[in-house]
């Protein structure tokens, strides 16, 4: 196995029993691939596939004018590179996007041409079509400076669906069957039975009409309709009675209404006897072709065809007429012998279409179409053209109706056709096929569809959603272009005059900015980012709504297996509607979710991996991943647990066709990070996977000692870590940047052989957490492509590290851990284990007001010297200043209107020249409850306005940093070039050169070292080829310098041009504060098993329970939190964590006493290779073994993969290895080594019972008490009721509600109650009166009339009831 640079430093011991057969795919692939197919930016315009933008353009173009003499054709499109990079867009509040230009061709035809159209003129031009936001490499979008994610949508696939109402509609409980044809866009077509078994159809959920109207409208006559849906009985009229053609299966089960005889007149079935199989056999044996029936047997039957008198041509009876005695007489009169009737019965051949035809009053095709027109457009007069146009537009027009590739495939599969391609509009036979299946269902044949089956729901990804929006914009443009195309020739217009890109831009902007599926990215930690991008929502436009979604849609379905996680979903109203993709899930070309399986042939598991969709999976028998497999791949168990068509069963190995690729296949990323997930109750696992996404990154991330082995994948795929693009040697490292000299074999010719990585330092995330990258390589390290070079937020040596490993004791402690409260040692706070940095962004804008411009300045009257001391000459706070609530960050004054002055004031003004009072201080201050350190300031100035010193200084610093980067690149490029030169020149013969180099001298190394490098180019070589090489190297260095100068100029131009600010804004200043949040009582914490709680007390270290060797616990949890919640995984994690730490301590002790490398190797082999997945420690050098051991001192990290984790024996073995008997005795451990004797920190006495102690990875969640704590004395009041506003954001008060009033009433505290309901709430005069009284030192409350009472009086008056108060 190949170890990466960082993996070698700290190997995670895995307890997995099964080899890795299939690597976890790149976790953001769905988003990135979808958007790249939408753009097809890297494909040449001629080779683009008809999808994404290309498909949208080709579906709308060509646009033809109303008169048909001008048309606008689409040629190709191109995307220009974005003007600003991602970081610049975030700083400036811009959208990271690219301008879209389309090359279109205006073709004008000759109106005079008599026969066929002749092209008169062609104009081709590139037209700007708006901006398309671009996806960042991590799968998000930067819209107006904030990162957003477009969530994929799970919607009902286009196609045809059959269902019944489960007997809920009608009181009898009868099943009413219905069918629905859903196109990708266009009108929905529904068919449904009513309780009387008449079949109706409706378009777009409008009024229902008999289905035969639709069949007539598509051109079928009543005869053809009946022929399509029924089989016929043939009768020949005889002078007495009639003869019926004998069809055996139609008679079985019927009761004979007369004696049935064979040809010779022998009675085979007597009257009133039920016809059974023996009777049929006898009739068959007698070779019966016809059966004689009495005449009344015909009465009540329904004619299948029109009966016409052969001589006169008169229609005697119509198709679908019942045969009556009158009809029979007419038939005999006209000497008609042969008639056909419909064969129906009550069991499997109902007369539904016949009875529908009977209530249908339309006569022919036109009448049927008029009826449909009247239903769609009530009140409009049906002219023939309008009727035809509407009907054709409903299902037959490609503009208005699109089944899509998926819809056609699903439709054809459902109606049993073999080919999966076909026209994208509805065809007549599609409608017929649907009705036939629906009638079959009513007849009891076939099954209805399961709507929640993942074969009937598909995923719409970013690319597809964006394409739909873009198409909608283009369609709006098309309407406008059509209008103007008529004037194109007369007014000599060019394509850009015809096309206005506004509708496209606004459609795209609206989608990315405010669609329900475009969400503000959850960026608390790397896991929350990845999960957000892998989310699949059933809500959104064209999806479900929370209120309408029933229980079935939200429930776990068997087809979710390996596609959608059954665990991770939000609690609350969205449960089950928002899901997460499973680890290995992937979308196929139709948008259906697929999951990988290993192929099994003749009960042998092969390495072939097939991706199966939910429908395909139903056809196979699939074994679980934990089935026992021998070395040669054969399945060894007699019976193997497997799944077939959604059912779990035990089958013999020879029946198995596929096998799961991994046990973690069924869960999502977040759930697969929970160790011992298999021992947790599902509800708690749900909470655990949701709470990991809320973990705040700690100051010093610490890897989980007990993990699942997927931590590295998550950290790397999330993009928070820095990965090497190319391998090479680390040339330079500091906290902000790394320079890597690329390997020769990876460097492209003519390219700079150097990669510079600028790290993200103390940047604010969307959730105000801190994103900061730290290098984990040192100069001289050799790295390969894909190695982790720097850790980001919540990552430790390239692994996800959401919390800290805490020494946990499960025991009650003086009621401080009652009801999930958490007791924490002061040492945890002192060591800054859970300290996190939060970055707040505060903005101030200087606008142009009616009274003059606002000004950002230091010159503010009556501001204390302490406050002014923090501001520079421009009035902006210094970086590094420590600020508290209320401190000024940016000084700003706003002009205010002239006030009328008294003569005295005028005099004073005249004497002192006091002019300061006509501006008011509107400075940016630190909000209440916040304090921190200023870490960054950004100043944006409108174009054409003088920059202040601070703004100029910020630009200069930025340019300085950029120059440093370029110099580094140049230094390495030149170094590299001169090394090659030295190798080339040494030993060559010279014709002369600097320092009087004689002709014919061989050049030596010493001579070159003595010369300045740039003078090497002055050496004249005898060998012409070498001389040419020397020139080439000189040119390439010059060229590189020129390139770098150009790049620098470009950067300077970008920085010095004015900033785009909203209208009316002259200047904007952003100040970033770093706030340090230490752990404190009231903060919410949780483990990974849904074991959440609130910190109740931080206890001095000396009072915490401690072990025999004096080691105190970090956290004390209540043991009662485990049994009822059934999340036993946390206890197993604690045991294994205890073993992991113990092993680390033993390795630390070996290093301390400088044990031999061989002893270290032996111990490490015992840890890694006794059970679980073996590691190749023999391939490590001695130095690597020592470095590995040093990194393991804090605990050997274990991986216990989901559903394939450590067993009880393995845990016991690890505990025995970590704590040999002598160590265990010193620690006071029980013989089983999973409990310890603890002592009370306050009394020193031993606790009565042993306690479970060990290490658990514990997280601090984003619900911090600092953000929630809030107090108010006076503040804003509501306008109408005059009561204080509510909530922290409004600086509101605490509501003293109904129940609180009852409490005071119960105590009889009438004065308290009075002040609560009056002066402390909405008695306006009383409020001021109280203040006056307090100032006078007179502590009396004069309660008046509450304002809300006045509101009540006004409301009663508005009802017309006059109500007055008698004030005495």
Swiss-Prot record:
Enzyme class: transferase
EC number: 2.7.7.6
GO biological process: DNA-templated transcription
Presence of the UniProt keyword Transcription in the record: yes
A molecular function (GO) term: DNA binding
Lineage top rank: taxon: Bacteria
UniProt keyword list: DNA-directed RNA polymerase, Nucleotidyltransferase, Transcription, Transferase
DNA repair among keywords: no
Any Pfam family the entry gives: RNA_pol_Rpb2_3
GO cellular component entries: DNA-directed RNA polymerase complex
Catalytic activity, as annotated: RNA(n) + a ribonucleoside 5'-triphosphate = RNA(n+1) + diphosphate
Membership in a protein family: Belongs to the RNA polymerase beta chain family.
Function, in words: DNA-dependent RNA polymerase catalyzes the transcription of DNA into RNA using the four ribonucleoside triphosphates as substrates.
Assembly with partners or alone: The RNAP catalytic core consists of 2 alpha, 1 beta, 1 beta' and 1 omega subunit. When a sigma factor is associated with the core the holoenzyme is formed, which can initiate transcription.
Protein name: DNA-directed RNA polymerase subunit beta
Organism, as annotated: Paraburkholderia xenovorans (strain LB400)
Higher taxonomy: Bacteria, Pseudomonadati, Pseudomonadota, Betaproteobacteria, Burkholderiales
Primary gene name: rpoB
């Amino acid at each position: 196995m190949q170890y990466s640079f960082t993996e070698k430093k700290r190997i995670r011991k895995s307890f997995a029993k099964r080899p890795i057969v299939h690597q976890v795919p790149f976790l953001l692939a769905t988003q990135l691939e979808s958007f790249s197919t939408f753009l097809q930016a890297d494909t040449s315009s001629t080779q683009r596939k008809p999808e994404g933008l290309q498909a949208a353009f080709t579906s709308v173009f060509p646009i033809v004018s109303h008169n048909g003499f001008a048309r606008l054709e689409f040629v190709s499109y191109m995307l220009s590179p974005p003007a600003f990079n991602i970081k610049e867009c975030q700083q400036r509040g811009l959208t990271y996007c690219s301008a879209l230009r389309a090359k279109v061709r205006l073709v004008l035809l000759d109106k005079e041409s008599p026969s066929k159209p002749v092209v008169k003129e062609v104009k081709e031009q590139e037209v700007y079509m708006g901006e398309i936001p671009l996806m960042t490499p991590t799968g998000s979008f930067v819209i107006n400076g904030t990162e957003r994610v477009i969530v994929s949508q799970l919607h009902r696939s286009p196609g045809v669906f059959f269902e019944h109402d489960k007997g809920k509609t009608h009181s009898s409980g009868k099943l009413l069957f219905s069918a629905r044809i859903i196109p990708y866009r266009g009108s929905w077509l529904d068919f449904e039975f009513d309780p009387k078994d008449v079949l109706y159809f409706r378009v777009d959920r409008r009024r229902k009409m008999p289905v035969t109207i639709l069949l007539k409208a598509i051109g079928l006559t009543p005869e053809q309709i009946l022929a399509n849906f029924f089989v016929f009985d043939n009768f020949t009229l005889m002078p007495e009675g009639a003869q019926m053609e004998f069809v055996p299966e139609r008679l079985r089960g019927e009761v004979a209404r007369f004696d049935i005889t064979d040809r010779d007149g022998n009675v085979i079935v007597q009257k009133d006897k039920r016809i059974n199989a023996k009777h049929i056999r006898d009739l068959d044996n007698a070779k019966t072709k016809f059966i004689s029936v009495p005449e009344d047997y015909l009465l009540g039957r329904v004619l299948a065809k029109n009966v016409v008198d052969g001589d006169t041509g008169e229609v005697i009876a119509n198709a679908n007429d019942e045969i009556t005695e009158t009809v029979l007489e007419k038939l005999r009169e006209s000497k008609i012998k042969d008639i056909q009737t419909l064969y129906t019965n009550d069991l499997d051949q109902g007369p539904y279409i016949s009875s529908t035809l009977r209530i249908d009053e339309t006569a022919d095709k036109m009448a049927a179409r008029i009826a449909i027109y009247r239903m769609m457009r009530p009140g409009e007069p049906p002219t023939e053209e309008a009727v035809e146009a509407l009907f054709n537009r409903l299902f037959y027009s490609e503009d208005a109706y699109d089944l899509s590739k998926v819809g056609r495939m699903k439709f054809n599969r459902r109606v049993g056709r073999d080919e999966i391609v076909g026209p994208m509009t509805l065809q007549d036979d599609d409608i017929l096929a649907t009705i036939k299946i629906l009638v079959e269902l009513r007849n009891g044949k076939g099954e209805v569809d399961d709507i929640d089956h993942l074969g009937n729901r598909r995923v719409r990804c970013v690319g597809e959603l964006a394409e739909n929006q873009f198409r909608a914009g283009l369609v709006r443009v098309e309407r406008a272009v059509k209008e103007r195309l008529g004037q194109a020739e007369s007014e000599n217009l060019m394509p850009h005059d015809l096309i206005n890109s506004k509708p496209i831009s606004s459609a795209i902007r609206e989608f990315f900015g405010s669609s329900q599926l475009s969400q503000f990215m959850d960026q608390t930690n790397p896991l929350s980012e990845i999960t957000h991008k892998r989310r699949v929502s059933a809500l959104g436009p064209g999806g479900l709504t929370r209120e309408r979604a029933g229980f079935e849609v939200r429930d776990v379905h068997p087809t979710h297996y390996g596609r959608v996680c059954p665990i991770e979903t939000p609690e609350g109203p969205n449960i089950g509607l928002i899901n997460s993709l499973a680890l290995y899930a992937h979308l196929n070309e139709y948008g259906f979710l697929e999951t990988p399986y290993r192929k099994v042939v003749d009960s042998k598991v092969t390495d072939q991996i097939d991706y199966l969709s939910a429908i395909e999976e139903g056809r196979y028998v699939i074994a679980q991943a934990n089935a026992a497999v021998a070395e040669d791949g054969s399945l060894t168990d007699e019976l193997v647990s497997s799944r077939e068509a959604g059912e779990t069963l035990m089958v013999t190995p020879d029946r198995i066709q596929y096998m799961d690729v991994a046990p973690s296949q069924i869960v999502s990323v977040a759930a697969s990070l929970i160790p011992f997930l298999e021992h947790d109750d599902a509800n708690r696992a749900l909470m655990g996977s949701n709470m990991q996404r809320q973990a705040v990154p700690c100051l010093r991330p610490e890897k989980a000692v007990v993990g699942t082995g997927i931590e590295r994948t998550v950290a790397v795929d999330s993009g928070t870590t820095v990965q090497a693009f190319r391998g090479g040697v680390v040339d330079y490292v500091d906290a902000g940047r790394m320079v890597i000299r690329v390997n020769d074999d990876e460097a492209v010719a003519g390219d700079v052989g150097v990669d510079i990585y600028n790290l993200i330092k103390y940047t604010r995330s969307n959730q105000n957490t801190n994103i900061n990258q730290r290098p984990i390589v040192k100069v001289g390290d050799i790295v390969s492509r894909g190695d982790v070079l720097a850790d980001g937020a919540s990552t430790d040596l390239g692994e996800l590290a959401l919390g800290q490993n805490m020494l946990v004791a499960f025991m009650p402690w003086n009621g401080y851990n009652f009801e999930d409260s958490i007791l924490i040692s002061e040492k945890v706070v002192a060591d800054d284990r859970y300290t996190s940095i939060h970055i707040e962004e505060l903005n101030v804008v200087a606008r142009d007001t009616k009274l003059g411009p606002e000004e950002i300045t230091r010159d503010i009257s009556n501001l204390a010297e302490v406050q002014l001391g923090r501001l520079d000459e421009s009035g902006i706070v210094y970086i590094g200043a420590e600020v508290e609530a209320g401190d000024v960050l940016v000084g700003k004054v706003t002009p205010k209107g002239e006030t009328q002055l008294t003569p005295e004031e005028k005099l004073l003004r005249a004497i002192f020249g006091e002019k300061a009072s006509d501006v008011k201080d509107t400075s940016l201050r630190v909000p209440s409850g916040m304090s921190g350190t200023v870490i960054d300031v950004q100043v944006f100035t409108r174009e054409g306005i003088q920059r202040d010193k601070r703004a100029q200084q910020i630009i200069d610093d930025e340019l300085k940093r950029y120059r440093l980067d370029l110099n580094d690149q140049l230094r390495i490029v030149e170094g590299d070039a001169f090394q090659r030169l030295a190798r080339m020149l040494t030993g060559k013969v010279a014709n002369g050169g600097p320092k009087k180099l004689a002709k014919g001298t061989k050049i030596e190394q010493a001579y070159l070292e003595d010369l300045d490098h740039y003078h090497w180019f002055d050496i004249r070589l005898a060998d012409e080829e070498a001389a040419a090489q020397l020139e080439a190297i000189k040119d390439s260095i010059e060229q590189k310098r020129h390139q770098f100068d150009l790049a620098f100029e470009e950067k300077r131009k970008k920085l010095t041009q004015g900033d785009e600010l909203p209208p009316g804004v002259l200047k904007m200043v952003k100040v970033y504060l770093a706030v340090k949040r230490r752990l404190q009582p009231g903060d919410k914490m949780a483990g990974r098993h849904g074991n959440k709680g609130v910190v109740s007390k931080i206890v001095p270290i000396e009072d915490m329970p401690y072990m025999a060797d004096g080691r105190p616990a970090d956290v004390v949890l209540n043991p009662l939190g485990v049994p009822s919640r059934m999340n036993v995984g946390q206890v197993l994690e604690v045991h294994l964590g205890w073993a992991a730490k113990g092993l680390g301590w033993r390795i630390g002790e070996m290093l301390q006493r400088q044990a031999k490398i061989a002893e270290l190797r032996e111990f490490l082999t015992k840890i890694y290779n006794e059970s679980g997945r073996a590691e190749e420690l023999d391939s490590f050098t001695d130095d690597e073994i020592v470095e590995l051991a040093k990194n393991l001192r804090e605990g050997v990290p274990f991986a216990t993969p989901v559903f394939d984790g450590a067993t009880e024996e393995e845990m016991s073995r690890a505990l025995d290895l970590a704590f040999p008997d002598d160590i265990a005795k010193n620690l006071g451990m029980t013989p089983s080594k999973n409990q310890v004797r603890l002592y009370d920190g306050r009394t020193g006495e031993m606790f009565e019972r042993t306690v479970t102690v060990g290490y658990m990875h514990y997280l601090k969640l984003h619900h911090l008490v600092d953000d929630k704590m809030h107090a108010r004395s006076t503040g804003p009041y509501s306008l109408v009721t005059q009561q204080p506003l509510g909530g922290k954001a409004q600086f509101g008060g605490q509501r003293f509600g109904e129940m609180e009033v009852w409490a005071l009433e119960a105590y009889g505290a009438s004065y308290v109650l009075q002040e609560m309901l009056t002066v402390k709430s909405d008695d306006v005069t009383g409020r001021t009166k109280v203040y006056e009284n307090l100032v006078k030192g007179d502590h009396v409350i004069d309660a008046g009339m509450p304002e809300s009472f006045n509101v009540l009086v006004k409301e009663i008056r508005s009802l017309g009831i006059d109500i007055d108060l008698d004030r005495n």
